[in-house]
Amino acid sequence: AERLLFVFGGGACVGADVTRKALKALGAASFTTYAGRGIVGTDDPLHFGAALSQPSSADVIGSADVVVVVGSELAEVDLWRAHLGHQSLLVRVDIDPQAFTNTDAGVLNILCDGPLLMRALLERAEAMDKSASGWSADEVAKSRAVWRADTDAARPGIALLCDALREVMPDDTMIYSDMTQFAYVAQDVWPMTKPGHWHHPYGF
C-alpha cells in the first residue's frame, strides 16, 4: 500500500512505542479515536490526530488504499456518521470478536492482539526497508489546521484556553473530563504525549 492508514482505539494503548516505530517504518498515516489519543507521538508528521468526528476526515480516509483499525469498535461518538469513509480494503484488528460488527464488503477481520500485530509489522517493514509514503506532511498539516479552525469557529476561544492550560501541565497529568464545552474542544485540539491519560465518559 502506498497510502496506508491506521486508526487506533483505546484497545491499542499498550505498546505505543512499538506502534510509533512501526508507523514510521511503514510510512503510514494515522488517526486515533478519542480513547486512543496519545498512542501516536505528537511529533509524527503523518498523524491526523483524534479528528474522526470531522466530516471531511471521511475524504482523507477515502483517499487511503488500505485502512487498518486497531482496537476500536468505531463507536458512534467517535465518528458521528454512519460510515468511516474508506473506499478500499478495511482491516479490523481486535481481541474481541464482538467488535467485528461491520458487514460492509471488503472488510477483513483479524482476531489478534493489536500490539503483537504492530510488532510483527515493524519487523516486516524493517526487513523490507519500507519507509516511503504516499502521504505528505504538508497535506496532514493542512487538514489539521482546517479542523482546528472549524472547532474554534464552532466554540470560539476555548482552543486558546486549552493551549494555555496545556503549557503549564506536566506531560504525565491524568485528566478526567465531563460533558462540558471545554472537554469537547480539548478532545479535538489537546495533543496527548502518552496513551491512557485522558478519560472521558463515552457512550452515555
Label each PLM-derived region with a short phrase:
Residues Y34-D138:
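Glycine-rich, acidic loop regions that bind phosphate or pyrophosphate groups
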Residues G9-A16, A154-A159:
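Active-site glycine- and acidic-residue-rich loops that bind
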Residues G10-A12, G36, S72-A75, T180-F182:
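Short glycine-rich anion-binding loops that position phosphate/pyrophosphate groups of nucleotides
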Residues E139-F204:
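Active-site diphosphate/adenylate-binding microenvironment
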Residues E2-V14, Y176:
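Glycine-rich phosphate/diphosphate-binding loops and the adjacent beta-loop-alpha structural elements
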Residues A1-L5, I61-S63, A164-T173:
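Glycine-rich phosphate/diphosphate-binding loops that line cofactor/substrate pockets in enzymes
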Residues G15-A35, T173:
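Redox- and metal-dependent alpha/beta enzyme cores, enriched for Fe-S-associated oxidoreductases
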